Every structure is written in structure tokens, then in C-alpha cells.
């Protein structure tokens, strides 16, 4: 029924029963959680996984019997969030899903009796933990909006949107026992029980050495963003493109553009060997670019303030640039800035996922005494 593994090979900490929730909107949460879950299982903990939407599909391919739940989703059009359509769709589907959610929790109480909850921005497991008096640990990048201070220059022009999204983040997972916030930038922490840790990296990325190449890697998950193809074609630069044409089963070449079906291994190889990267505001891609020292032109999804904030910190650090949209001039300025970005990125260092895993091990150990 649920993903359950027995306790084997545990190190210094006692085996625990952990309820782990993953929000389904955006693949970054699922990719990060896969890495953390692998580590938890390797430490001998028993883990029940509850996830929604695409996260459930992704995790079910790696872990047995992931339990699917209803979660929030976002509707996009022309690289923008459509707020009204998103709201009504979530209300309609959420009400219909509520009885099944409650049945799942009753089953969980009877069959598993978790000792601690870990939430990657997932509300249902958080609520379960709070209503059952369990320690709740938050692991995600979204909490940087709520639990850190951001200066006025960084937020210029998005102040109102920032306040709204910060309020949403604050209301979604309040009063956790600990917040482990993944980030490649380090603004002042204002929230209690908050620790900034480096981004979670896929082991495949850590194991792939960065090499100097000449191609641009382009990763765009919104299929409504076809206008980008014309700009890239006009640049004359070799571009390896993922995401724009999801129906592909093999490479499709048009002049200097190579459209590729998504394959994780080949994507990582193209990322590690790229001269530079163009992507949306994905925190996962942004973090991997920084780790591999690849300059990034980030084009956040309209209405996603968290992506805008991350992209502005990226630009402030000199690791890349950000733009609302891409035209020939924006692309030319970015290409000209690549050497300078490479110089700034050369000083960035991260020891894999050690800092996060050490922090999580301490939190799990201390949760026993709470």
C-alpha cells in the first residue's frame, strides 16, 4: 500500500518511521526528495511516501508503492501563471479529493504509526504531523521567502507580489520544528529554527565532471514558449534544447538547433559540457548550473515570485543573468557576459550533499527527545 522499507545498515542513529510528503507541482521537489529518500533508506529508516501529481509518477518509478494524494497544481499559458484558472481548478478537484485523503490518513495511523514527518512543501503530511503531535521537519527552497530578509533593491518592482507569495509560504507550513532551507545564496535568516543548507544535488550531477564546451543547453518546460526557437535559430549558436517538444522520441535537428527528448543521463551530460545554459526559473537547474560553474540566463515564469527572487540573487552573485523574456539583444548580452560569469562561478564550492545530510541526521536524532 505504501512505500515501506525495513531498517537495515543503520549507522549511529536509531531507525525511525518517517512520513515523507512531496508536493507535486514542479519537478524540483520530486528530484530533491528522491535524493533525500535514497539517503534515508540507506540509513535504515522506514519511510512512507505520500506525493501528488508528477512527483508521485516520478518517485513511483524508484520507490515501491508510493501513495498518491491530491495536491495543488498550477496552470500555465505563454510562460505565465494563470491565477484564476489555477484557483478554481484546485478548489474543484480539492473538494472532490478530500474523502480519499482522510481515508488514507486513517490507514496510515493503523498500519504505520510514523514517529516524525518530513515535508517538501506538502500540506497533507504536515497537517497529519501537527494533528498527531509529531515533530515536523521542512526541507525545501520556498521557505527562503519567509524565513530570510531580502533587501529593497532585490525586490524592486515585485514588492506586492512578494508579500503575497511570502504570506502563502508562511501559511502553508507554519511552526515546523525545523526548517532546512536549500539555497545557493545566503540572505540573513530571520526565522527561528531555520538553517540554510546548500542545494540538494542529484548524485549523477555530483559524479559528472564539468568540461568546457561550445553549445548552449536550453531547458524550457512550458510548451507555450515556442517563440524562443526563433531567437535561438537567429543566434547561429549550437543549441541543445529540452522540453519545448515533449512528443519527441529522438533528436530533431533544424539548422543550429537540436531538439531532444528528455533523457536524464544525456541531459546531465549536455549540462556538464555546456558553455552556458538558458532555462526558466527552475531552482534545481539553477543550483546545478552554479555547482557545475555554468553561466545561466534565467527566464522566470511570470507570476512565480520565488523564481524571480532566485534569479535576481543569481545575477547579483555574477553567476548569470535574468530577463523577463528572451529576444536577440538579451541573448547577445548574455553571451557576451559568459566569460565574466565563469570567473565568478570559479569560486563557488559545495561538498555534495554532506551539509544537508549532517543537518538532517542531527534533527532526526534530536526529534527522539522532543
Task: Set out the residue ranges of the language-model regions.
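A short, glycine/small-residue-rich beta-strand->loop->alpha-helix junction that serves as a flexible
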Residues: 21-34
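Donor-nucleotide binding loops and adjacent catalytic segments primarily
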Residues: 37, 200-276
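Conserved nucleotide-sugar phosphate-binding/catalytic loop shared by glycosyltransferases and other
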Residues: 42-43, 48-96
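Conserved nucleotide-sugar donor-binding subdomain of glycosyltransferases
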Residues: 83-116, 123-124
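A donor-sugar binding/catalytic signature common to diverse glycosyltransferases
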Residues: 116-120, 269-309
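Active-site-proximal region of nucleotide-activated glycan assembly enzymes
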Residues: 135-196
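Nucleotide-sugar donor-binding patch of glycosyltransferase catalytic domains
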Residues: 155, 252, 261-262, 295-341
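C-terminal amphipathic helix plus adjacent low-complexity
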Residues: 333-370
Amino acid at each position: 500500500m505504501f512505500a515501506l522499507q525495513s531498517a537495515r545498515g543503520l549507522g549511529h542513529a536509531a531507525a525511525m518511521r518517517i512520513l515523507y510528503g512531496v508536493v507535486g507541482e514542479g519537478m524540483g521537489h520530486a528530484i530533491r526528495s528522491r535524493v533525500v529518500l535514497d539517503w534515508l533508506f540507506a540509513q535504515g529508516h522506514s519511510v512512507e511516501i505520500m506525493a501528488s501529481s508528477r512527483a508521485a509518477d516520478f518517485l513511483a518509478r524508484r520507490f515501491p508503492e508510493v501513495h498518491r494524494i491530491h495536491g495543488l497544481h498550477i496552470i500555465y499559458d505563454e510562460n505565465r501563471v494563470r491565477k484564476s484558472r489555477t484557483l478554481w481548478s484546485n478548489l474543484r478537484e480539492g473538494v472532490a479529493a478530500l474523502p480519499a485523503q482522510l481515508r488514507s490518513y486513517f490507514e496510515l495511523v493503523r498500519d504505520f504509526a510514523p514517529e516524525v514527518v518530513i515535508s517538501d512543501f506538502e500540506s497533507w503530511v504536515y497537517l497529519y504531523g501537527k494533528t498527531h503531535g509529531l515533530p515536523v521537519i521542512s526541507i525545501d527552497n520556498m521557505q527562503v521567502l519567509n524565513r530570510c530578509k531580502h533587501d529593497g533593491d532585490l525586490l524592486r518592482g515585485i514588492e506586492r507580489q512578494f508579500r503575497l507569495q511570502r504570506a502563502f509560504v508562511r501559511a502553508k507550513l507554519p511552526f515546523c520544528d525545523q526548517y532546512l532551507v536549500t539555497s545557493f545564496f545566503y540572505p540573513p535568516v530571520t526565522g527561528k529554527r531555520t538553517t540554510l543548507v546548500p542545494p540538494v544535488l542529484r548524485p549523477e550531477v555530483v559524479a559528472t565532471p564539468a568540461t568546457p564546451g561550445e553549445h548552449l543547453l536550453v531547458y524550457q518546460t512550458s510548451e507555450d514558449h515556442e517563440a524562443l526557437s526563433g531567437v535561438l535559430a537567429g543566434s547561429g549558436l549550437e543549441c541543445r534544447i529540452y522540453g519545448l517538444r515533449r512528443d519527441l522520441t529522438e533528436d530533431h535537428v533544424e539548422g543550429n538547433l537540436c531538439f531532444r527528448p528528455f533523457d536524464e543521463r544525456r541531459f546531465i551530460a549536455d549540462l556538464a559540457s555546456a558553455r552556458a545554459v538558458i532555462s526558466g526559473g527552475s531552482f534545481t537547474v539553477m543550483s546545478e548550473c552554479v555547482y557545475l560553474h555554468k553561466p545561466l540566463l534565467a527566464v522566470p515564469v511570470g507570476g512565480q515570485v520565488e523564481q524571480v527572487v532566485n534569479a535576481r540573487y543569481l545575477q547579483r552573485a555574477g553567476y548569470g543573468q535574468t530577463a523577463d523574456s528572451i529576444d536577440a539583444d538579451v541573448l547577445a548580452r548574455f553571451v557576451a557576459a559568459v566569460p565574466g560569469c565563469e570567473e565568478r562561478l570559479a569560486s563557488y564550492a559545495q561538498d555534495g550533499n554532506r551539509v544537508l545530510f549532517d543537518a538532517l541526521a542531527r534533527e532526526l536524532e534530536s526529534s527522539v527527545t522532543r
